[in-house]
Amino acid sequence: MKLDGYTRLAAVVANPIKHSISPFIHNRAFEATATNGAYVAWEIEASDLAETVANIRRYQMFGINLSMPYKEQVIPYLDELSDEARLIGAVNTVVNENGNLIGYNTDGKGFFKCLPSFTISGKKMTLLGAGGAAKSILAQAILDGVSQISVFVRSVSMEKTRPYLDKLQEQTGFKVDLCALEYVSELQARIAESDLLVNATSVGMDGQSSPVPENIVLPETLLVADIIYQPFETPFLKWARSQGNPAVNGLGMLLYQAAEAFQLWTGKEMPTEEIWQSLTEKYQ
């Protein structure tokens, strides 16, 4: 990697973040595209967020990525928001356009790009969870023309989830069905008519638990996706594959949301196939 007086910085900002795979992805991309850039991880306190954003202008950076807990907190410090960032209410990418800081959310686009030979337009989706990743997938699905979305959360989370779905309906005219995860018969019925089933919860990161009961029967044509990428195969994905269904983990989402950010910063396409090979060799 070339480092000199002309090198431009990009960074991922979060807390914690030292475990991040993003520097590996972006620095490989800078090198592969002969871009004079370097990407680092900044673990900061909330009190340093305003100054960190100011440094994007000060040091003429490409921009930054954001992860928890700063995806929403960063918004007041930005000059503009993209349509999807406004709809989601969260930003994962800030682009420095000649000192004008624009917030984007590439998570949803990254998720749908990682699905093999699948487009969400006109399809039905069942989504487990309603956190930050789920919101980005929800909003992008609506923007891309999904025909039906069923969101399942634990009954204790229903009240907290409904206001966001109501806001989405106000802004887009699209009604999302909200259901309790404990109602297994309803979960089975929704999955049976779906084209895509997504686990957007953290259940399965322990390598042992699954967000759905194992007696759920999956339709043959259903594509199953999990946003988790460590472990590489969660119990949820293993269960789906045991029924003969195609199943995708979250590593592709991580790569393709990064590719969207990289293009916004540099105007260049990230060589995703080459980097995917490096990623799977390193993290599988």
Swiss-Prot record:
Subunit structure and binding partners: Homodimer.
The encoding gene: aroE
GO molecular function, one term: NADP binding
Record-linked InterPro entries: Aminoacid_DH-like_N_sf, NAD(P)-bd_dom_sf, SDH_C, Shikimate_DH, Shikimate_DH-bd_N, Shikimate_DH_fam
Amino-acid positions noted as binding shikimate in the UniProt annotation, renumbered to this chain: S20, I21, S22, S67, N92, D107, Y229
Active site: K71 (proton acceptor)
Leader sequence residues: none
Reactions this protein catalyses: shikimate + NADP(+) = 3-dehydroshikimate + NADPH + H(+)
Family to which this protein belongs: Belongs to the shikimate dehydrogenase family.
Recorded metabolic or biological pathway in which this protein acts: Metabolic intermediate biosynthesis; chorismate biosynthesis; chorismate from D-erythrose 4-phosphate and phosphoenolpyruvate: step 4/7
Transmembrane segments: none
Record key words, sorted: Amino-acid biosynthesis, Aromatic amino acid biosynthesis, NADP, Oxidoreductase
Name of the featured protein: Shikimate dehydrogenase (NADP(+))
GO annotation terms (biological process): amino acid biosynthetic process; aromatic amino acid family biosynthetic process; chorismate biosynthetic process; shikimate metabolic process
Free-text function comment from the UniProt entry: Involved in the biosynthesis of the chorismate, which leads to the biosynthesis of aromatic amino acids. Catalyzes the reversible NADPH linked reduction of 3-dehydroshikimate (DHSA) to yield shikimate (SA).
Protein EC: 1.1.1.25
Binding site for NADP(+): D83, G129, A130, G131, G132, A133, I227, G250
Superkingdom as given in the UniProt entry: Bacteria
Species in which this protein is naturally found: Streptococcus pneumoniae (strain CGSP14)
